[in-house]
A protein has these predicted regions:
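Extracellular and secretory-pathway beta-repeat/beta-biased strand scaffolds
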Residues: 1-241
Length: 241
């Protein structure tokens, strides 16, 4: 379901949304998922860009425009069998985002072509996206993708007052049962990263630890916990950079 919303105000979701399939939401002025709100869908995409087209055969979504709005998530959002994607100049997550065995992306890039998970690759492909109005990403809540992929990416230019990415919450791609841990990427192409939360990519009983990649063009300050443990019964540790 594609919903291009042309409104002078942010779209406010204060109650519940339930859907089995993919839900695409576009509003240049942003979105507010209020405290106590609940979203349970197959997959969710919310962006301040205009969605020009979607190719169901390749999973390619073409974004245009740089909406100035913010996406602020304070509620519980769950993708039962797919992905969650937030694409806006500013993103604040103080709620819970969950996509078991799926992919979650928070990105300030809102121009170009985005490739959805399950098509050209395992997870989101944001290589062809860019932005001219990026600000920051703040993560204070919980993000989990059991054995899946989480990307937090900002190309905002770092200022003296604010890092491009600031994460104090939980980020978890550990897998339950047997299997390998997932993949986490936190990328600040033009700015700094401050990380003081817990980041986990642990294996299950039998499996290898996953991968945690944190790269900042300017400064990186990490005072939190980073874990990519191998399985409790068998398996090797993962990779942290």
């Amino acid at each position: 379901t594609l919903n291009n919303i042309l409104d002078a105000n942010p779209s406010a979701i204060m109650g519940s949304i339930s859907a089995n399939g993919q839900v695409f939401l576009s509003n240049p002025n942003g979105f507010i998922f209020g405290a106590g709100s609940s979203v349970n869908v197959g997959s969710l995409m919310a962006t301040t860009a205009i969605i020009d087209s979607f190719d169901a055969n390749t999973g390619a979504i073409v974004f245009s425009g740089n909406g100035s709005g913010t996406i602020h998530a304070m509620g519980d959002i769950e993708a039962s069998d797919g992905y969650i994607g937030f694409f806006a100049p500013e993103i604040i997550n103080s709620g819970s985002l969950q996509a078991d065995a799926g992919s979650i992306a928070l990105s300030t890039e809102t121009n170009g072509t985005l490739y959805l998970p399950g098509f050209a690759g395992v997870g989101f492909n944001i290589d062809d996206l860019s932005s001219t109005d990026a600000r920051s990403i703040t993560h204070e809540g919980e993000i989990s993708a059991d054995g899946g992929q989480i990307i937090i990416s900002s190309d905002a230019y770092d200022s003296a007052l604010q890092s491009a990415i600031n994460t104090t919450g939980m980020i978890d791609v550990s897998i339950s049962g047997n299997g390998d841990g997932g993949n986490i990427q936190i990328l600040a192409a033009n700015g700094s990263i401050e990380q003081s939360g817990v980041i986990q990519a642990n294996a299950g009983s039998n499996g290898d630890g996953g991968e945690i990649l944190i790269i900042a063009d300017q400064n990186l300050k990490s005072s939190g916990q980073l874990q990519a443990k191998g399985g409790t019964d068998s398996g090797d540790g993962g990779f942290i950079e």
